[in-house]
C-alpha cells in the first residue's frame, strides 16, 4: 500500500537536478499532514523533497495501518513507487517515532541518515507501556465520539504544549479541526507508545548519521536528549513543534546536518551506463 504524498523538485540551480537523489522525506505528527513541512522543505530546496501523508491524515485519510512494522513497510512501498533510491528521513513527534522505527527495524536500503524532531524513544517497561496504551485509548474514544474542536482544546493543554499561548492554541485547534476524528483515533491506537519498542539500543547501533532536533522551550525532549546523550541540535524561540514556530532556523539546522554528514550516493556503487 502506498501513501499519499507530494513531490517538490529541487531549485532550478541545484546540483540535485543532475541526478536522482538523495531526497528529503518528511513525516508529520499526529493531526498533521505532509503540507506541515512545506515551509521547511522549500527552504531546503537544494534537495528534492517527498512530503508524506501518514495513514488517517491528509490525503491518506482513508488508509489505515496495524502498527509500526506495517507503516514502515508502507513508507518503503511509497518510496519505491516514487522511484526514490536514496533519502534522508525526517520526522516530527509521531513522525519522528515512525522515522526512528523505520531506521532501526525497517527496510532501509538507500537510507542516508535520520533527523528526529521531538520524537519519543519509547517506554522501558511493560507496565509503563500498558498504562500509556490505556491513556491513548481514552483519547481515541474522545476523537471518535466527541466534537473535534472540543477534544483538540483539551489535547493542546497537555504539558508538551506548555510553551503555547492561548492564541497559538486557538490557531492550532482551528487548523487541526479539519481532521477526521475516527481516522485520528485509529492511528493513535495503532502507533501508541504502548506498542512502540524501546528504540535507544537500536538507535545507538545505527550505521547512518542521525540528529535530534528540539526547540529550546521543549523541556521534556531537551531532557530526553541530555539524559540519553542524543546528538542534540536546539532551535531558538521554539517549543515542541519547532519547525512550525521557526521554519527558517529549522531548515538551517537541517542543511547544516546534511552538509556535515558525509555520504556516498548510491550511484557511486552502480556500474557505468553503456
UniProtKB/Swiss-Prot annotation:
It holds the Pfam family Abhydrolase_6. SUPFAM superfamilies: alpha/beta-Hydrolases (SSF53474). It catalyses: 5-enolpyruvoyl-6-hydroxy-2-succinyl-cyclohex-3-ene-1-carboxylate = (1R,6R)-6-hydroxy-2-succinyl-cyclohexa-2,4-diene-1-carboxylate + pyruvate. Its EC number is 4.2.99.20. GO terms for molecular function: 2-succinyl-6-hydroxy-2,4-cyclohexadiene-1-carboxylate synthase activity. It comes from the Bacteria. InterPro entries: AB_hydrolase_1, AB_hydrolase_fold, SHCHC_synthase_MenH. Catalyzes a proton abstraction reaction that results in 2,5-elimination of pyruvate from 2-succinyl-5-enolpyruvyl-6-hydroxy-3-cyclohexene-1-carboxylate (SEPHCHC) and the formation of 2-succinyl-6-hydroxy-2,4-cyclohexadiene-1-carboxylate (SHCHC). PANTHER family: 2-SUCCINYL-5-ENOLPYRUVYL-6-HYDROXY-3-CYCLOHEXENE-1-CARBOXYLATE SYNTHASE, PROTEIN PHYLLO, CHLOROPLASTIC. HAMAP family: MenH. Monomer. This is 2-succinyl-6-hydroxy-2,4-cyclohexadiene-1-carboxylate synthase. It comes from Yersinia enterocolitica serotype O:8 / biotype 1B (strain NCTC 13174 / 8081). The lineage of its organism: Bacteria, Pseudomonadati, Pseudomonadota, Gammaproteobacteria, Enterobacterales.
Amino acid at each position: 500500500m502506498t501513501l499519499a504524498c507530494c513531490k517538490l523538485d529541487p531549485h532550478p540551480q541545484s546540483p540535485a537536478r543532475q541526478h536522482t537523489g538523495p531526497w528529503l522525506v518528511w513525516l508529520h505528527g499526529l493531526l498533521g499532514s505532509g503540507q506541515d513541512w512545506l515551509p521547511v522543505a522549500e527552504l531546503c530546496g537544494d534537495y528534492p523533497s517527498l512530503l508524506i501523508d501518514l495513514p488517517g491524515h491528509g490525503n491518506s485519510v482513508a488508509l489505515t495501518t496495524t502498527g509500526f512494522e506495517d507503516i514502515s513497510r508502507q513508507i518503503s512501498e511509497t518510496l519505491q513507487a516514487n522511484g526514490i533510491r536514496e533519502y534522508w528521513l525526517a520526522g516530527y513527534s509521531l513522525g519522528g517515532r515512525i522515522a526512528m522505527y523505520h531506521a532501526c527495524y525497517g527496510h532501509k536500503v538507500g537510507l542516508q541518515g535520520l533527523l528526529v524532531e521531538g520524537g519519543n524513544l519509547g517506554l522501558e517497561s511493560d507496565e509503563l507501556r500498558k498504562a500509556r496504551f490505556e491513556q491513548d485509548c481514552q483519547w481515541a474514544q474522545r476523537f471518535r465520539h466527541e466534537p473535534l474542536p472540543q477534544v483538540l482544546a483539551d489535547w493542546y493543554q497537555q504539558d508538551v504544549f506548555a510553551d503555547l499561548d492561548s492564541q497559538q492554541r486557538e490557531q492550532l485547534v482551528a487548523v487541526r479541526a479539519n481532521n477526521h476524528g475516527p481516522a485520528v483515533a485509529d492511528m493513535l491506537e495503532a502507533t501508541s507508545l504502548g506498542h512502540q519498542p524501546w528504540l535507544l539500543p537500536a538507535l545507538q547501533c545505527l550505521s547512518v548519521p542521525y540528529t535530534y532536533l528540539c526547540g529550546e522551550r521543549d523541556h521534556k525532549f531537551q531532557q530526553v536528549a541530555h539524559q540519553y546523550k542524543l546528538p542534540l541540535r536546539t532551535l531558538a524561540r521554539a517549543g515542541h513543534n519547532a519547525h512550525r514556530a521557526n521554519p527558517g532556523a529549522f531548515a538551517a539546522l537541517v542543511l547544516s546536518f546534511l552538509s556535515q554528514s558525509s555520504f556516498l550516493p548510491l550511484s557511486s556503487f552502480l556500474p557505468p551506463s553503456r
